[in-house]
Curated annotation (Swiss-Prot):
Residues 55-80 have a biased composition (Pro residues). Phosphocholine binds at G119, L120, S121. Keywords: Acetylation, ATP-binding, Cytoplasm, Disease variant, Epilepsy, Intellectual disability, Kinase, Lipid biosynthesis, Lipid droplet, Lipid metabolism, Nucleotide-binding, Phospholipid biosynthesis, Phospholipid metabolism, Phosphoprotein, Transferase, Tyrosine-protein kinase. The keyword Acetylation applies. This is Choline kinase alpha. GO terms for cellular component: cytoplasm; cytosol; lipid droplet. Its main location: cytoplasm. It comes from the Eukaryota.
Amino acid sequence: MKTKFCTGGEAEPSPLGLLLSCGSGSAAPAPGVGQQRDAASDLESKQLGGQQPPLALPPPPPLPLPLPLPQPPPPQPPADEQPEPRTRRRAYLWCKEFLPGAWRGLREDEFHISVIRGGLSNMLFQCSLPDTTATLGDEPRKVLLRLYGAILQMRSCNKEGSEQAQKENEFQGAEAMVLESVMFAILAERSLGPKLYGIFPQGRLEQFIPSRRLDTEELSLPDISAEIAEKMATFHGMKMPFNKEPKWLFGTMEKYLKEVLRIKFTEESRIKKLHKLLSYNLPLELENLRSLLESTPSPVVFCHNDCQEGNILLLEGRENSEKQKLMLIDFEYSSYNYRGFDIGNHFCEWMYDYSYEKYPFFRANIRKYPTKKQQLHFISSYLPAFQNDFENLSTEEKSIIKEEMLLEVNRFALASHFLWGLWSIVQAKISSIEFGYMDYAQARFDAYFHQKRKLGV
């Protein structure tokens, strides 16, 4: 998902340091032109008539040779797909310094970079070697550059916050990025995610996997849904070296709510939208939600926490395979959490299409929430992969577990709407990306109250 990001200070990027800092920088220097070649030719001198001896004349200056035409720069994507010069410069340096082989000697004018659209929390770029450059070993020809979004290094949304509070926010942001990077590296080593090529305070370099992200409509396809369920069950079964207490869900919502209650907008339309959202008495609503979910059994597992179509890759060349054609990516929100949230959140994402190209740059359709039949299809694929002895249970026992799980995930779907609703209000304040964050927040809270009515809670 897309947000404002910092690209560091004026110095060249360094792998050292944890805290991000926004600074100024300069544009990349223009590429030089080729050197002019010199040439000379020997011409015979002419003899003069009369009695005088012939004089040796100095040779005339060499005939001018045509200047070689400057070599055109490597083809680049259209201007609207190019990052700003400062970001391009830093991307080049990161690739040159962190990647081996041909990247080490790559000239800046040979460097290819283009923006990858579609995220809402990070800025993504594809960086590549030119076609004319041969690799020297097994180094990648293409990599993915991820620059962290503001939400990971979130500072207070209001400048009047105390210096101590600002320092705490900076520390928490740095801690979140360190944990996320460790998590990414572990998943890469276990072949459950892309390879990690480089890491630095502002982001990282990842394996570029030939693939495409799923479309929202594909989430409901039976074979796709079944494999997502199996992948999620595998994710939930992992043992990770992180805090096992399920603090993430309500801890994150409380942090976002604290920021939301302090946010001040100057734009009239945003003021009105915020006033409407605050009229829901969000602190009381959060306490009621907490009470409901505390009474809802749900195992604590290692959760992805953002399993939406943009974070699921359909691998190139495996489109027609029955299984193993998908890969989960983007683990920045992953943590130990309640299983019901991860699945309920995924079901909520069936309703939202983030590929819409006009304001507010998303479409919501509450009727796309999975039916009971679709939910049971997902759960029926999930449970055998999650619970080893599930297939040995009786039909009646299986039915009871499935019904309990339906209640679990549909209640925790409420938390998904509440969390991302608050998140979007915060993004409206701190993000520089063109997206209707306040409209999205309203859509999520509309769905939250709709889900409450359906559940009768």
